[in-house]
Amino acid sequence: MPQATMIFPILFTFFLLLSSSNAAVQDFCVADLAAPEGPAGFSCKKPASVKVNDFVFSGLGIAGNTSNIIKAAVTPAFVAQFPGVNGLGISIARLDLAVGGVVPFHTHPGASEVLIVAQGTICAGFVASDNTPYLQTLEKGDIMVFPQGLLHFQVNGGEAPALAFASFGSASPGLQILDFALFKNDLPTEVIAQTTFLDAAQIKKLKGVLGGTN
């Protein structure tokens, strides 16, 4: 009986190692975008239906449309756009910032981010969980890392358009923009006022700008 008790955890661990990652047992797991996405990502396409185009994404050479309220555009090459990264723990995106452009405070719940500036000047930073801010003005060629789940931002700090590329440690890093979470939905004004100490008039103004109600 003691021997059987010892064998069971060993077998269980062995089973977990075999089943924990498609990448551990096959070369790749191209996402089957026709299937639903689960907590572990998309299921794999059958190898016979995989094409070279599944491993190629051509959208990062095209400037995004910055004619919007934040004067910024993000072109993602996440698993939904680039099925070849499924299961590999990587993805990338292009960031265009017009003069005065800003990516408001946001988080990526599923991944850390590395930002490299390709053109212009970008003021970027994040706030640690102890509320310490870390800010830096980045020039062409500079790189900054944003740890997973922490609030961070990017602002065009120059007098010309800025361009950057961001890589992520997940095929689907997720995104939540703080301003949108507060003011671009039907979260009641009184609740926001109680939890942020903003006055109702300011909240309604921000809801009006961002398309929220209540």
Swiss-Prot record:
Gene3D superfamilies: Jelly Rolls (2.60.120.10). Pfam families: Cupin_1. Mn(2+) binds at residues 106, 108, 113, 152. InterPro entries: Cupin_1, Germin, Germin_Mn-BS, RmlC-like_jellyroll, RmlC_Cupin_sf. SUPFAM superfamilies: RmlC-like cupins (SSF51182). Probable receptor for the plant growth-promoting hormone auxin. This is Auxin-binding protein ABP20.
